[in-house]
Design a protein with these regions (language model features):
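The conserved beta1-alpha1 loop
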Residues: 101-102, 242
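Gly/Ser-rich "nucleophile elbow"/oxyanion-hole loop immediately N-terminal to the catalytic nucleophile
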Residues: 153-197
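Primarily recognizes the serine-hydrolase "nucleophile elbow" in alpha/beta-hydrolase
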Residues: 190-232
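C-terminal catalytic histidine-bearing segment of alpha/beta-hydrolase fold enzymes
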Residues: 237, 241, 247-300
């Protein structure tokens, strides 16, 4: 029988076509049958990139080029305005909603940066034609200039950013956007997914902690340090990714959260990439199993 390590190695060296094609489900099931969420984080092959993984990433960049143009520019106004981008699928009926939270490089109010640079992976993978064919969904990419974590309001007025427990200002506003979209479009409330990288990964922990049992699943890449310790909303399926050579957010941050979540009764999946620095999103969002795993999750 395939071991957990063999399964992840196989996924890491899958063919370019298998990375995005619907037929990938055939080996995803076997890989997860061999995986147990109680095991230590799987150490997957990492830097220097194998030719197979490099081919996957380059193929993704080529196939996804220009997909950002399919996002509609919108904004939610209020006490402060949150710009956001929305992809609307061609399919009809109740459909899932994927929410992507950008990293610090996506901050601002231009409604552009959250789709560019390192964010291309997390915002475009869902739009690939083969993924939309099998897993049609709405995709939301909000942009925050307030971060995603919760900052002490009194100190924030003085320009001091001190994180404290509670719903983040940016995260809370993004949830307002989500709720507005649920009223405007036929979103499947049982299949709302959230994910993010770096600062957005920390924001993902903030969201699932402070709005428990709302999201069907979460995918987190190198989540930044926030007051959230990983124990919030333990029923929510989580797949956490981190490079073991991350010089920006130490891998220990993810290890501690995953350990705490398991101790509290949760069952998160965790994958570490050997030799990979902070750009783990290039690996995570081209992981052949991720798309199939995500859309298999359903709340309730």
């Amino acid at each position: 029988m395939m071991t957990r390590r063999d399964a992840v190695r196989w996924l890491g060296s899958a063919s370019v076509g298998a990375c995005f094609a619907a037929s990938a489900a055939s080996f995803v099931a076997e890989a997860f049958a061999a995986a147990t969420d109680e095991a230590p984080p799987t150490l997957a092959p990492g830097a220097p990139m194998s030719p197979e993984r490099l081919a996957l990433i380059e193929a993704f960049k080529k196939q996804s080029d220009g997909l950002e143009k399919k996002y509609e520019a919108r904004a939610l106004k209020g006490d402060w305005t949150m710009p956001y981008r929305l992809f609307k699928p061609e399919a009809t009926g109740k459909l899932p909603l994927v929410v992507y939270l950008h990293g610090s490089g996506g901050q601002g109010d231009d409604n552009l940066k959250q789709l560019g640079l390192g964010n291309i992976f997390g915002t475009r993978v869902w739009l690939l034609p083969e993924n939309q064919k099998k897993f049609p969904c709405y995709v939301l990419a909000p942009q925050s200039n307030h971060g995603w974590a919760h900052y002490d309001p009194a100190k924030l007025e003085k320009g001091v950013y001190e994180m404290v427990p509670g719903m983040g200002q940016g995260a809370g506003k993004a949830l307002e956007v989500i709720d507005a979209l649920r009223k405007e479009f036929p979103v499947d409330d049982q299949r709302i997914y959230v994910m993010g990288q770096s600062m957005g990964g920390g924001g993902t922990w903030n969201m699932i902690t402070n709005r428990p049992n709302f999201f069907a699943a979460a995918a987190i890449c190198c989540g930044s340090i926030t007051p959230e310790d990983g124990t919030g909303s333990i029923e929510t399926p989580v797949w956490n990714f981190h490079g073991d050579s991350d010089n920006t957010v130490p891998v220990s941050v993810s290890r501690e959260r995953i350990a705490a979540r398991r101790k509290a009764g949760g069952h998160p999946l965790a994958t570490e990439y050997a030799g990979v620095d902070h750009n783990v999103w290039e690996w995570a969002f081209t992981e052949p199993a991720l798309v199939t795993w995500l859309f298999a999750q359903r709340r309730g």
